[in-house]
Amino acid sequence: MKFSIIIPVYNAEKYIDKCLASILGQTFENFECIVIDDGSSDNSNIIINKYTVNDQRFKVIHQENMGVGAARNAGLDIAKGEYIIFIDADDYVTNDFLEKFALKICSTNADIVIYSLTELHTDSIRSIVFEANNTEEIKKNILASVWPSYSWNKCYRKYLFENIRFPVGEIFEDVLIIPEVCLNAGKIVCIADKTYYYNKQ
């Protein structure tokens, strides 16, 4: 089992080191991390290179600034893992992030795993836990917008993106395709453990 982690980066020098360090520290080591530098004009690339030079699992794509949708698509185009994970450059994960996915996938054979998260605000922290009894309940929650259509709080079997790509130049590009991706999935499960730190500061 191999994971492809896709991280779009645009002028994220304040955050990207912590993000990539959290990937480097994973207890489950069979992954590739594809970082897409979306035309950054700050020092993001210098920080990214620190990882790509020292660890072959980290790869970087440089492109002109085309937006997060195009950046995620560029990562999807070269991803070699069986499972796809999107992480935003200003977020980070726990060191057992991938290990929990691997265990859940092995025990359930799920096409999508939805994970719970911790929201980081300037003056507060909020826990968001996703739980459901079955796949149909999860799909209803996503299609009815009861649950958010984030791309980054899910692990996807790669085949779900064979014929689907993110729209380019659109705001809230996740909302435009993630419900369809989830609808096409066979089995969807949740992890109650909060393994993702979502920076809303």
Language-model features: where?
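Short aromatic/hydrophobic "clamp" motif used to bind/position activated sugar donors
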Residues: 84
